[in-house]
């Protein structure tokens, strides 16, 4: 279970870096927001889901220790 927790945290960090770069670029480029709006919303939904999954996994891992 610890490996799943670490994998989820790694995925969250990686996705955060991608969103940190992608969102400002999409907002600053003319016409880019309309093209990438669904992708950015999907990334934000995935980011939120990872936060919830990490919270659940953290409680499971903490109870095993």
Swiss-Prot record:
User: What's an example GO cellular component term for this entry?
Assistant: photosystem II reaction center
InterPro entries of this UniProt entry? PSII_PsbZ, PSII_PsbZ_sf
Q: What membrane topology is given?
A: Multi-pass membrane protein
Cell compartment(s), UniProt: Plastid, Cyanelle thylakoid membrane
In terms of SUPFAM superfamilies, this protein maps to: PsbZ-like
Q: What is its main location?
A: plastid
What stretches pass through the bilayer? 8-28, 41-61
One GO BP? photosynthesis
**Which keywords does this Swiss-Prot/TrEMBL entry list?**
Cyanelle, Membrane, Photosynthesis, Photosystem II, Plastid, Reaction center, Thylakoid, Transmembrane, Transmembrane helix
Q: What does this protein do?
A: May control the interaction of photosystem II (PSII) cores with the light-harvesting antenna, regulates electron flow through the 2 photosystem reaction centers. PSII is a light-driven water plastoquinone oxidoreductase, using light energy to abstract electrons from H(2)O, generating a proton gradient subsequently used for ATP formation.
Record family assignment = Belongs to the PsbZ family.
Q: How does it assemble?
A: PSII is composed of 1 copy each of membrane proteins PsbA, PsbB, PsbC, PsbD, PsbE, PsbF, PsbH, PsbI, PsbJ, PsbK, PsbL, PsbM, PsbT, PsbX, PsbY, PsbZ, Psb30/Ycf12, at least 3 peripheral proteins of the oxygen-evolving complex and a large number of cofactors. It forms dimeric complexes.
Identify this protein by name: Photosystem II reaction center protein Z
Recite the lineage of the species.
Answer: Eukaryota, Glaucocystophyceae, Cyanophoraceae, Cyanophora
């Amino acid at each position: 279970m610890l490996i799943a927790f670490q994998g989820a945290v790694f995925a969250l960090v990686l996705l955060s870096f991608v969103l940190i770069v992608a969102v400002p670029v999409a907002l600053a480029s003319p016409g880019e927001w309309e093209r990438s709006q669904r992708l950015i919303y999907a990334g934000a939904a995935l980011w939120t889901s990872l936060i919830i999954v990490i919270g659940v996994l953290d409680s499971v891992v903490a109870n095993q220790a």
